[in-house]
């Protein structure tokens, strides 16, 4: 993937294709296409993305295919009666990444249930059709892409959508059920499937779907294609500051993506910045892609900070501003912090042993009688706290001079102005 990113930066393709073979439910359509920008990204590019999608669908249909203009993601795994959900993908997928770069991409999904010759033929037809459409509209689309680049450089301080309501089932918020699109907004479609049965399997003990490809059947099922933002944030007005201790790792990532940044040669004193205080962090129960992911909640707040030399400044005023925000806004689904690059920020470096905390608590009571009253009130009003010895000692540890108040602070800062 890193090698591919280098090629993307070198070539800067206007349109790319991501070729896949998928499995899942069995049905008559032999190929599905999901084109972006259509559901996300620059508004002008969305219109042209729709033109690209519809043009490809028309070409494939004229050649005998039954193409779908969306990836057929079942609302409930292995249950055709549940219908489909239109998924808007995050930037770790090609359909989420290229809109951040103001470029077009086509997710091509043929079907593993079809024979090999069919898969090759429809993939070939798609590639040729894509090239033909670029030949017809490429100059216009390229001009629009460059206009989107210029517009993206002006997005500082603007509210941006970083995630959408969808049903992609890879965990993005650990320990929480994925929210499905509202059935009240679903529409019923007639989908060309096959007859099937769902019987309890003696092997798994679960319902197993078995299709009969010799018996075509029209499925009247809900299609949840209403796309709504689920995470909207205000982009930094000036840019993001990466502290010196993370400069090498993050700088390498930024270079791979073609994002411009500036090493800070001189320290900043009392800089007016924003910092993100993490209220809650939930780690994935197991590693994914070799990393321990984390989902965060919290908020930005203004403060003054000294910034040592060696930090990186990443200006928002550049064509890849959408990608910058996707990487640095901590709640974004594929931000650097979500992928575990700043997990050290959650570690407790210092601690007070219980016997020490007991002595410190008594000394703190003597020094500040109001603290004893506050502690007594919390014991009275919070039964869970009163019954938890660790929480009671932590009450004092957090108020002691040795406590690390930078724990649960996201290390990347925002600034309202260019540095």
Walk through the language-model features, giving the residues of each.
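Structured catalytic-domain cores with a bias toward divalent-metal coordination
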Residues: 1-419
